[in-house]
């Protein structure tokens, strides 16, 4: 597997998510050069100025510039946050069709530059669009990664931490499957400060109802945030920064992302949310969790939901 070099990142799409990612990236000092591409040139110019002025106070020497696709040639990563939002009355398939076409155009321009790094995709529906980027790019599957369930898992860990009054970093639990309505929590392998959640359930049958409510709040959080402020941005921006750090610092850590399956969970030829070990080469390996029969049934439903959409386009 090829290992990328340097710490230059090209960000495509400077909407709420893209700018939140850029802000997190600068504050964590991960990129030497962040080149940003967006169709709204005037707004992009303002964001680049604003971000550069903040670099003074960050533990960072990141240089932020208005980018072009030529910047992709020597980039270690291209991060895609661009895409169309769903309009009133527009079906999900219509939205997917529109965004698949956008991905085809973006990826074509990126690959024409001679890019040979790692794609990180955040545009929704992320699992389908990550598959599209992989197909259009012609790169090895391990070098095309989607944000997947990184945000869903973070939300779940945060809410479990609130329930048990422990830091989210002491909660180890994953949301897997589609980044969307068919995702599922893996309660069977979850731990709170080292204590198995399954063991807690055995001792307290009423806990099951509270956990189901936490999962529903996790799954539906985006709807509430969008209703309140128009979009989600900070959580996913920080999640993308976490994946970026795992890649650029060659960390070999397991992160919940959208990855191509090759027989894991009995599935293949589909990008879907699952833990994967990530390093400078992209995805080193997909982690297949040991899940219960009920969890497997829900995962299969999630995979089939994605496949039904995917086959309309590929």
Swiss-Prot record:
Any GO MF annotation of the entry: L-lactate dehydrogenase activity
Family: Belongs to the LDH/MDH superfamily. LDH family.
Active-site annotation: 179 (proton acceptor)
E.C. code: 1.1.1.27
Disulfide-bond pairs as recorded: none
UniProt source species: Corynebacterium glutamicum (strain ATCC 13032 / DSM 20300 / JCM 1318 / BCRC 11384 / CCUG 27702 / LMG 3730 / NBRC 12168 / NCIMB 10025 / NRRL B-2784 / 534)
Enzyme class: oxidoreductase
Protein name as it appears in the record: L-lactate dehydrogenase
Pathway named in the protein's UniProt entry: Fermentation; pyruvate fermentation to lactate; (S)-lactate from pyruvate: step 1/1
Subcellular location: Cytoplasm
Activity regulation remarks: Allosterically activated by fructose 1,6-bisphosphate (FBP).
Residues engaged in binding NAD(+): 17, 38, 43, 69, 83-84, 105, 122-124, 147
Main subcellular localisation: cytoplasm
UniProt keyword terms in alphabetical order: Allosteric enzyme, Cytoplasm, NAD, Oxidoreductase, Phosphoprotein
Plastid as UniProt keyword: no
PANTHER family from the UniProt entry: L-2-HYDROXYCARBOXYLATE DEHYDROGENASE (NAD(P)(+)), L-LACTATE DEHYDROGENASE
GO BP term (any one): lactate metabolic process
SUPFAM superfamilies cross-referenced by the UniProt entry: LDH C-terminal domain-like, NAD(P)-binding Rossmann-fold domains
Phosphotyrosine, modified sites: 223
Residues given in the record as beta-D-fructose 1,6-bisphosphate binding sites: 157, 172
Gene label: ldh
